[in-house]
């Protein structure tokens, strides 16, 4: 795509930046610059990825890698054994069938040891949060998160904890699965009402969950409710009431695991049993095994994905993931080339960007699809692990100043508008759309002018088309190199892709964001 020329006003300074007014309501900003694929690749660590169906209203099998033999629905079992290091990612939402549906949905993960010897499953790190434990609150564009207490949404909080190395106290360090046995790894509620029991999976199997308090029922006139009549003998007309909301709640779980032998896993969803008195009971391991053996895939099923190889027109559906993906982390050092050990900074006023979490049909013109490939999957689920939710990106930028004078460099994390036709450029929107495309924490490591290592966690909230303020600004002496390390666990509440941009501020910064919202904190600098 060519940079649009009609009614375009060029900003001063290199490189060419075009600002186009769109109906007087917003400006579109097109900046010519390099957009680079990320060097390196995903590792080979398998990921148990349970995300379809996202909304669960019919109990059943979410994802099973068990062998299909002897199962009532063999097509629901993908026959994949884990051994050694692997990850687990599960994100599901419980939603009632109507405003009065307050049943408690439980989410379980069971582990089967098919071998003749005990298998130890080490839980290296594990976190799980409900929506009410991490509500979607309004946060500024960027905020320092010193203690990990800045988050918005369960995906944001879960990914932030993983990045910090946090494990919740209720998880064991390991479990041992006897030969030929099945064990529960987790058995957690996704409640649709306030429960007076622990919600972290520690409430024992078979224990009673008190039934909800009885709500008053108001009868309509047609059902015999008495209404006061008006003077003319007719009943007063009541104003229409607002529709009652459907109860909904979500849970996001991520784990880093290591198995001493081959094991099979399954994630399952079922409602708590109901007693004769109307109370509920926590499902037992036997309940889950019966569902695993006799059950079908949970529902309702998500929209099937579009096939990039045969897609021609209309809306492109990525689908949601249910299967085993290959790739848990992407670790690389960004350099000028494979033969170089440094990354030369751009000339004054120039910038270049690297794509993060690029997907089919949205790579910012690089053609690089970073989505993890699927080892096994259900036919109606995503062809790749689009978004790389839960994948850890670890990037080192050895920034080299080839100039004879000091240069001031800014690093930005940005959410451009998708445009596959734009070559060597990025497109933004001023102001950005109101839709939030990224909520998550980024870790920065660098040395200040005194050579002291600095580590900062920044929680970011970005909207579609947002240019953003710098994450950090550094002054690099002539002919010197400064390392900057950027780490993030790509959060489930985000919409990919994004870019990491290196900008030379030593000339007029025509790329500076213009946002109606004030920045929440000063840009980090090497003296911060």
Report residues per predicted region.
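N-terminal low-complexity, Pro/Thr/Ser-rich intrinsically disordered segments
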Residues: 6-42
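Long compositionally biased, domain-poor regions of proteins
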Residues: 13-24, 58, 64-124, 129, ...
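Non-catalytic, interaction-prone regions of core transcription and DNA-replication machinery
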Residues: 27-79
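Well-ordered mid-protein domain cores that form the structural environment of catalytic cofactors
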Residues: 121, 128-156
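Low-complexity, serine/threonine/proline-enriched polar segments
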Residues: 144-168, 173-175, 445
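Internal, well-ordered alpha/beta segment that forms a basic, Gly-enriched binding/recognition surface
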Residues: 178
